[in-house]
């Protein structure tokens, strides 16, 4: 890292979900851009990650896996997993309660959609970036038609106390900002990155041995 604590293009780092100083998800990524105003991270097929074992084996069965119950009890068990399908470009902006993601189908290189992931504002660490996924998402087509995703999970997180009331207020404010961007086709929902492609010499990054260290 530089004296400004900014990463260089191509650097392998990790993006983590962290709750109460416990990693709940860890994704290896490559840095595409890192400035005081914006950070862009690349998820490539083949990238290593650590995912809750309940998500891997029971993601669609709420009777067998409850994300917030595990998270609140600090009992999340992470299992190594290899990302296989789409290519993600994750755009982070300081202090914002969401990230904007460009998604391409890796095999065909076709753009799939924009994706708004509501999350805690990111924090820089010596390993990369920490945040926390807050379940709620918006899927935005290339035509800018949109739909909510995971609203039930978001409401459950609120009811269980995992998603705090002040976070909810910040997400409501963030929603207004996102909808204004959709309506105006404003950056980054303006296809600015649509034709961007990763360096073909970049390999999918691996996780560092100390992926679980909290700064």
Predicted regions and their residues:
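Charge-rich, low-complexity N-terminal segments
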Residues: 1-85
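Hydrophobic residues embedded in beta-strands of well-ordered beta-sheets
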Residues: 38-40, 111, 146
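A short, polar/proline- and glycine-enriched secondary-structure boundary/capping micro-motif
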Residues: 50-56, 126-127, 157-161
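Structured beta-strand/loop patches that form or line metal/cofactor-binding pockets in enzymes
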Residues: 82-136
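A hydrophobic, small-residue-rich beta->alpha segment in the mid-to-C-terminal subdomain
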Residues: 134-181
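Cysteine/selenocysteine-centered motifs that mediate thiol-based redox chemistry or coordinate metal-sulfur cofactors
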Residues: 173-215
